Each structure stands twice: as C-alpha cells, then as structure tokens.
Regions:
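N-terminal signal peptide c-region/cleavage motif recognized by signal peptidases
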Residues: 17-19
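Initiator methionine at the very start of the polypeptide chain
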Residues: 1, 21-22
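Sequence-level preference for short, compositionally simple segments enriched
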Residues: 23-370
Length: 370
C-alpha cells in the first residue's frame, strides 16, 4: 500500500507528459497529384477514416469542386470542411422510387440521400449538399403519365438513426421534397440555407435551426388560390421528447413564382408503423415544431399550420391528423407573413429557446456557442 502511494505522483506526472492524441487530417480534391493523404472521392477518405479506430477527431478538408457521389459518414468524430457552399458541392440524384437498394431495409426515402450521417459527433461546414433529382420535370407530368414517378422524394441530408451531436454550419442543403430527413437524435444547423418545397424538413429528430434561411422552391404545377403550395416542416416527434424541430431567429423566404399566402409552416406527420395489431399511422408520433423570433415572408399561409393524412387501420390514407392535436408553437414572428388567423392552436408547453439549448447541448459544449 505504501509503495503504491509513493508511485502515485510518478504516474500522475507521466500522464501529464503524454501529449493529447493529435487529430488526423485528410484532403479531398478533384486532382491530388502526389499529395499525401489526398483522395479524389469523399467516400474513399471517409472509409480510410473509419478504419482508424482511435478516439480522435478526423478532419477531412474538401477542396473547391463538384463531387457527384453518394456518401455515408459512419465514424464518430468526423469534421467535414469544404471551401464554402459556393465553391464545394456534393450532389447525387437518387429518388425514393428506385433508391431502396441503397438502404438497409429497402426504404426508398432514406435511401435517396446524397449525404447520410449515421454517427455521433459529426461537424459539416462550408459545403453545399444537393439532391439533384429532376423534381420539376416529374412534377409537370400528368398523374396518368407512365413516365411519372409517384415516389418523388429526394433527400439531400439524412440524419440517420445512430446520429447524434451533429453540427452543420455555413452550408446549403438543397432539394425539393424531403430535403432534410431528421431521423436520429440531436442536431444543430447554423448560418445555413435549407431549400425545398414539400415537407422539406421532417422527421422525429431533435433539431435546432438557427440564424439560417429556409427557402421555399417552386412547383411545376399551378396551385389554386387558397390551396397549399408547400409545407416547411413535417415533424414526427415521439411524445417522450419535449423538443422536435425548432427554428430560431431565421428567415423564411421563397423563390420567384411561389405565390403569396400559399406555404404552411408545417403539418403533423404520423409515419406508417407496424404494431402487434396491424400497420397504421403511429399515434405516439405527436410532432413538435416551434418558430421563435423568425422573419416570415408573404408566401406564408394565413393559417400558418395545416393537417396531414396518414394510414388508417384499414390501410387507407383516410386518417386525418390536425395541427390542433399536435405540438405546434410560434412566438416573436415578424414580417409580412407573421399575421395569422386563429385556427385553435392551444398547446402551450413549448420550451423557450434557453430551455431548448439546455436540452440539446447537454454533454455537447462544442455546439453551444455560435
């Protein structure tokens, strides 16, 4: 016992003398030449990083360029850093109708993602991530046209089931339907652009979008006055989670051609789920969405929120889920789209931004400061 006590200071000094594990660094570039640790494909760099099982950060610097590939991040502590969203672009053109082959359960929507993040502690910055499926050409086809693709979802970024503590900043996430699929745990998107039209920010994840732009893109079909052109959010937050999709201090904008008073802030998504007594819309997916101190353009519909159909117990899409039965909240809205009709939204248990931050940043100090 005495000997151990005498040796304790020695081991303490030795521990202090051991340097911290250095981060690993790789480069992705359209042309590497003789440069070491350089790859022409992003997935090759990520695969090499995954083979490194040490508990340190791996930084992958992605040079300016246009990268057409489908990418998955499955290693923890990855930092993906582009040259700027106007210089570095990752894109892929998969669509849900045919993308099941890319997914572990043959599901087309998550399979369509240009970038899948399925790991803890991931930072993505300085890059555009785009699903380039030709949505508008397909949208213009008549329903009876055999060339029309019915499942036209095209995800740009999938936050998959094992993702947590994902920070996306100074980035552009571009698509049309289902641009950002939040299907994991915590994520923060900061100083970025997210664009799309149909339910283009959706899922059961806990996401804070702050100091960003949410831009509605056009449709190829004419929308009658009073009808909904697009929907920003479609949360499917489980009841046990107090935070779903929170948009803070951001601007809601539109492309030219998107009509006034035509875009809903959100609608409740109850995903079709298999239970012991059948397959139907999940009654426990009571979506939570908040808009806090946001500037809303004139394209926002005066009702602000709307309903969404789901799968009934008989298998038909006749179950209707209303915003009044969801966890929708807004406060501090400004701009021409801020005024709205009272449609009976009464839920008052939303967390304020301080509480949202406290909930999301527990054990994640790196994301707490802009």
């Amino acid at each position: 016992m005495l000997r151990a006590a005498c040796l304790a200071p020695f081991f303490a000094i030795l521990a202090l003398a051991v340097p911290a594990m250095a981060d690993a660094h790789y480069t992705v570039s359209p042309s590497c030449g003789n440069q070491k640790h350089c790859f022409t494909r992003l997935q090759s760099a990520l695969d090499t990083a995954k083979a490194d099982t040490r508990d340190h950060w791996v930084t992958i610097n992605v040079a300016a360029g246009d990268y057409y590939e489908k990418v998955t991040i499955s290693r923890h502590k990855i930092r993906l850093s582009g040259a700027g969203p106007d210089k570095t672009r990752l894109h892929f053109d998969a669509v849900a109708e045919t993308a099941g082959k890319y997914h572990r359960r043959n599901w087309g929507t998550p399979g369509s993602a240009a970038l899948t993040i399925n790991a803890d502690q991931v930072t993505v910055e300085g890059i555009t991530i785009e699903n380039t499926f030709d949505y508008l050409t397909n949208d213009a086809l008549p329903d009876a046209d055999p060339k029309r693709i019915s499942n036209s979802q095209g995800v740009a970024v999938l936050l998959d089931i094992d993702s947590d503590r994902v920070l996306i900043r100074d980035a552009a996430l571009i698509g049309y339907q289902d641009t950002l699929f939040a299907n994991g745990k915590r994520a923060v998107i900061r100083d970025s652009l997210i664009s799309g039209n149909i339910d283009f920010i959706f899922g059961n994840g806990q996401v804070l979008i702050e100091d960003s732009e949410i831009r509605t893109r056009n449709r190829a079909v004419a929308i009658a006055p009073g009808e909904f052109h697009s929907y920003l959010l479609a949360p499917s937050t489980t009841l046990i989670q107090p935070v779903g999709i929170v948009v803070y201090r951001s601007k809601l904008t539109r492309e030219a051609g998107v009509p006034d008073h035509s875009v809903a802030l959100g609608r409740p998504w109850h995903p079709t789920t298999t239970f012991a007594d059948g397959r139907y819309a999940d009654p426990n997916a009571v979506g939570q969405a908040s808009f806090i101190d946001c500037v809303m353009g004139a394209h926002i519909h005066p009702d602000h929120w709307t309903s969404m159909n789901g799968t009934a117990r008989d298998g038909t899409k006749t179950a209707v889920f209303s915003p009044q039965d969801s966890r929708f909240f807004e406060t501090g809205s400004t701009g021409p789209g801020a005024a709205h009709r009272d449609i009976g939204i009464t839920w008052k248990d939303a967390l304020d931004i301080t509480a949202v931050r406290r909930h999301l940043f527990d054990g994640w100090p790196e994301a707490s400061a802009p």
